[in-house]
């Protein structure tokens, strides 16, 4: 049997009070529906049907080249009607897994348990026990066996006391699913075609109905408004923080960290408060991340340190390298072993060699800097001529004095010294001292202009 996943994502989400389709609202910097698609892919599904409606242009622009079949639900007439739109893409021998684009925290392990619970040619539904089941469809059992699902608005007083509720997530044999969908009626309080009605049909047809439950109820919570969205965000962040701690990271305060991607950590990593991780971030052993740092798609080697309020994006730090506080590493930047940049240093598309330092107030762009180099405060690599970028090469052992401009393309030879305040436009040979300052003048008795009173 092939696994065919149907994701329902057609709703507008009026209670979000937004022009953005509900399923595109983000959890951890990724749309809710993208979380669901990623989980479906992790199951090894052979096909994914994405049922869409409101905001089609925005959905397709956001999801881009996803490996999904786009299935239009022109009118939103209920969950059963939504699934029926995908009938043409469902084979009789498929196992059809039905998911929801606004339920982003469902786990692969839970869905595997649901699929494992389904007997051959039977169906399995994901249920959860809630202390306050108000608003949810109730699971109706007779002698322990599931016989149907009753929606809140259609339930009687006895049924309203049931605490086991329907999550909407189910695994159904393709052949029977299409038959049951064709038999759905909208004769109910909402005048909609309820997908849940197929459970009673399965019972009537003698089909086995099994159940599974998630490890946590938050997995099956949806977001209909921004308050619920924030609750899901916090649950996601709590789970992500716990994962980091179990893998060897020390979090100063697990409630004050934001993980918006995939973070891999070594042992004894220390992460201070209000740190943001985005994209793919790799931290080696004994790495220290200071408060307020932002790390995006970067690699930090063993014993390196990111000091407070430093931004590292698309960059690499070698062993025992350090950056910050208040430094910025832009894409293509690399600090080799024991290299250091300090406060208010920006480095882009450049390599700072082993043991080299730029302590403060410098811009390093499109540069190859060797080992043991000192970059003085206020140094700027002038890499852009208004049309093209040019390379600055600074070889091993160079000392660059404060307030120096290097006008690229230019090469500074080994162990050269550039005097403070110099503008370097030509190559410098090894071991040379170069000073380009104008001659200092002394004007005696100089009077500063006096501001005229109005």
Curated annotation (Swiss-Prot):
TM region(s), chain numbering: none
E.C. numbers: 2.7.7.23, 2.3.1.157
Cited function: Catalyzes the last two sequential reactions in the de novo biosynthetic pathway for UDP-N-acetylglucosamine (UDP-GlcNAc). The C-terminal domain catalyzes the transfer of acetyl group from acetyl coenzyme A to glucosamine-1-phosphate (GlcN-1-P) to produce N-acetylglucosamine-1-phosphate (GlcNAc-1-P), which is converted into UDP-GlcNAc by the transfer of uridine 5-monophosphate (from uridine 5-triphosphate), a reaction catalyzed by the N-terminal domain.
Organism of derivation: Shewanella denitrificans (strain OS217 / ATCC BAA-1090 / DSM 15013)
GO MF: glucosamine-1-phosphate N-acetyltransferase activity; magnesium ion binding; UDP-N-acetylglucosamine diphosphorylase activity
Residue numbers binding UDP-N-acetyl-alpha-D-glucosamine: 8-11, 22, 73, 78-79, 100-102, 137, 151, 166, 224, 330, 348, 363, 374
One term under GO cellular component: cytoplasm
HAMAP family the record matches: GlmU
Record-annotated active site: 360 (proton acceptor)
Keyword annotations from UniProtKB, A to Z: Acyltransferase, Cell shape, Cell wall biogenesis/degradation, Cytoplasm, Magnesium, Metal-binding, Multifunctional enzyme, Nucleotidyltransferase, Peptidoglycan synthesis, Repeat, Transferase
Top EC class, one word: transferase
Protein name, entry field: Bifunctional protein GlmU
Metabolic or biological pathway, per its Swiss-Prot or TrEMBL entry: Nucleotide-sugar biosynthesis; UDP-N-acetyl-alpha-D-glucosamine biosynthesis; N-acetyl-alpha-D-glucosamine 1-phosphate from alpha-D-glucosamine 6-phosphate (route II): step 2/2; Nucleotide-sugar biosynthesis; UDP-N-acetyl-alpha-D-glucosamine biosynthesis; UDP-N-acetyl-alpha-D-glucosamine from N-acetyl-alpha-D-glucosamine 1-phosphate: step 1/1; Bacterial outer membrane biogenesis; LPS lipid A biosynthesis
Protein family: In the N-terminal section; belongs to the N-acetylglucosamine-1-phosphate uridyltransferase family.
Listed cofactors: Mg(2+)
PANTHER family tied to this protein: BIFUNCTIONAL PROTEIN GLMU, NUCLEOTIDYL TRANSFERASE
PROSITE patterns linked: HEXAPEP_TRANSFERASES
Subcellular location: Cytoplasm
Subunit description: Homotrimer.
GO biological process, one term: cell morphogenesis
């Amino acid at each position: 049997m092939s696994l065919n996943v149907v994701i329902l994502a057609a709703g507008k989400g009026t209670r979000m009070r937004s022009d953005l389709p509900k399923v595109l609202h983000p959890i951890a910097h990724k749309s809710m529906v993208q979380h669901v698609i990623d989980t479906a892919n992790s199951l090894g599904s052979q096909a994914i049907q994405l049922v869409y409606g409101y905001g089609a242009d925005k959905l397709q622009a956001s999801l881009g080249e996803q490996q999904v079949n786009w299935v239009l639900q022109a009118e939103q007439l209920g969950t059963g009607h939504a699934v029926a739109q995908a009938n043409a893409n469902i084979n009789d021998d498929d196992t059809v897994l039905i998911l929801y684009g606004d339920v982003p925290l469902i786990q692969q392990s839970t869905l595997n348990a649901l699929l494992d619970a389904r007997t051959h040619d039977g169906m399995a539904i994901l249920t959860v026990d809630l202390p306050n089941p108000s608003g949810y469809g109730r699971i109706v059992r007779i002698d322990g066996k599931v016989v149907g699902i009753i929606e809140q608005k259609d339930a009687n007083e006895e049924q309203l006391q049931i605490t086991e509720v329907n999550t909407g997530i189910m695994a159904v044999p393709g052949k029977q699913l299409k038959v049951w969908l064709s038999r759905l009626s909208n004769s109910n309080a909402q005048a909609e075609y309820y997908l849940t009605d197929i459970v009673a049909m399965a019972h009537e047809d003698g089909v086995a109905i099994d159940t599974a439950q998630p490890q946590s109820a938050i997995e099956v919570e949806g977001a209909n408004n921004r308050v619920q969205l924030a609750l899901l965000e916090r649950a996601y962040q709590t789970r992500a923080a716990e994962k980091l701690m179990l893998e060897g990271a020390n979090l100063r305060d697990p409630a004050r960290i934001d993980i918006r991607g995939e973070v891999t950590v070594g042992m004894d990593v220390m992460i201070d408060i209000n740190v943001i991780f985005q994209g793919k971030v790799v931290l080696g052993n004994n790495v220290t991340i200071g408060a307020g740092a932002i790390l995006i798609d970067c690699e930090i080697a063993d014993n390196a340190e990111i000091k407070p309020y430093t931004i590292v994006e698309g960059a690499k730090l070698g062993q025992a390298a350090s950056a910050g506080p208040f430094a910025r590493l832009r894409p293509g930047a690399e600090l080799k072993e024991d290299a250091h940049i300090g406060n208010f240093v920006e480095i882009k598309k450049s390599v700072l060699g082993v043991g080299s330092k730029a302590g403060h107030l410098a811009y390093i762009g499109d540069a190859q800097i060797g080992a043991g180099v000192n970059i003085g405060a206020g140094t700027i690599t002038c890499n852009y001529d208004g049309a093209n970028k040019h390379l600055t090469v600074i070889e091993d052992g160079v000392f660059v004095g404060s307030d120096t401009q290097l006008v690229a393309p230019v090469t500074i030879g080994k162990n050269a010294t550039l005097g403070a305040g110099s503008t370097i436009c030509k190559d410098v040979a090894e071991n040379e001292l170069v000073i380009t300052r104008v001659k200092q003048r002394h004007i005696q008795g100089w009077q500063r202009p006096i501001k005229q009173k109005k």
